[in-house]
Amino acid sequence: MKDRNTMTTIAVVGLGYVGLPLVVEFGKHSRTIGFDIDAAKVAACQAGHDPSREISDEQMRLAQHAEYSADALE
């Protein structure tokens, strides 16, 4: 696996029914930042839970390179 500093970074805007599955799948292989303005949704994702319950906690855990933020400056 590549070092985090040389790994490709992917950003996905919106953690809804389209964005979150993308973050989870890409996050299994590359650093992926999921951004959403809903801080509660971001907090749930950071805790390893999909607020819409479409993605299992196990799938969320497998996305080891996924990060979640409500701060556009990160």
Regions found by a protein language model. Give the residues of each.
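Structural/interface elements that position substrates and couple domains in central-metabolism enzymes
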Residues: 2-74
